[in-house]
Curated annotation (Swiss-Prot):
InterPro entries: Beta_CA_cladeB, Carbonic_anhydrase, Carbonic_anhydrase_CS, Carbonic_anhydrase_sf
Family as reported in the entry's similarity comment: Belongs to the beta-class carbonic anhydrase family.
Catalytic class of the enzyme: lyase
EC number assigned by the record: 4.2.1.1
Location within or outside the cell: Cytoplasm
UniProt xrefs under SMART domains: Pro_CA
Pfam families referenced in this protein's UniProt entry, alphabetically: Pro_CA (PF00484)
Reactions the enzyme catalyzes: hydrogencarbonate + H(+) = CO2 + H2O
Name of the protein this chain belongs to: Carbonic anhydrase 1
Organism: Flaveria linearis
Amino acid sequence: MSTASAFAINAPSFVNASSLKKSSTSSARSGVLSARFTCNSSSSSSSATPPSLIRNEPVFAAPAPIITPNWTEDGNESYEEAIDALKKMLIEKGELEPVAAARIDQITAQAAAPDTKAPFDPVERIKSGFVKFKTEKFVTNPALYDELAKGQSPKFMVFACSDSRVCPSHVLDFQPGEAFVVRNVANMVPPFDKTKYSGVGAAVEYAVLHLKVQEIFVIGHSRCGGIKGLMTFPDEGPHSTDFIEDWVKVCLPAKSKVVAEHNGTHLDDQCVQCEKEAVNVSLGNLLTYPFVRDGLRNNTLALKGGHYDFVNGTFELWALDFGLSSPTSV
C-alpha cells in the first residue's frame, strides 16, 4: 500500500492561470502563489530489494518517484510554511533531494530570466525595413533606380488579393517597374461600370491605354477569406457587413457554378474550386472594358489566370480562349 507525501513550494508571482488564487496572507510575500508537489512512494521503510533473475526473466525495480506540481486552490500556505514542509519532506525522504533541487532550480531560473521579447514597435519596423531595402537593393542597383526615376513601362498588370500571405512581388519575384499591381479582397475584377468600382476601372484604363501593358494577370490563392465569404454569405437578404458582401458578389457566378457542379462536397473543397472559378469570372469581366477588347483583337494584350497554393507551394497558370476576332465588313 502506498502513501502520498506532500510539500508546498512557492511559485513566482508572474504565473497566471484561471485556476490559481493569490495567497491571502498579509505578509510581504502575500502575492506569491503556493504549489503543492505530490510524490508517491512505498510506505515500507526498508530499502528496495535489488533486481534479480527469476526463471531467466528480468525483474525491474520500480521507477524513481517523480515530483508533480499540483496547484492548490486555496493557496493558504505561507512562504515560511512551504519551506518548512519542504525541509521536513527532504529529511524524511532524502532520495528526493536531487529531484526537488532540480525543480527549484528550474523555477528560480524562470523567475530570474529577463523578458527578452520587446514590444512591437511599428515605426521601428518601418524604419528598419526601409534601411534594409536601401542598403541591400537601392544602393546596390543604381542603374535600375536611375531608369525608374524616368518613368515606368511594366509588362504586367496584376490583380492579386490583399491577403498578407500572397504578395505577388514576393511570390513571383517581380522587380520594381515590372508589374502594375492592384490588390483587393479576393483579387476580383468587376465588370465595366462608370457609376461604381471606379478605382478598378481607372487602374485598368491607365494600365492598358497609358502604360501599354502586354499582360493582365488575375491571381487567386488558397484559403482565401473573401472566397470563403462568397461561398457562405446568403445570396439574398440583408447584409451583415457594410462593404464585404456587396464586393465579393462580383464573382457570384463562380459560386453558382461551383454549387451546381460540386454540390454535396465539403465546403473547403468547394472553396478551392471557387478560388479558380472566380479568377475566370474576373477574366470574363475584363472583356466588358472596351479598351481591353481592343487590345485582345489587336494582339497587343493577353489575359491569363493563376492560382497560388501557399499550403503546398504550387502555382497554376492558364489562359482562356475567348474566341474574339477582328470585325469584318461585308
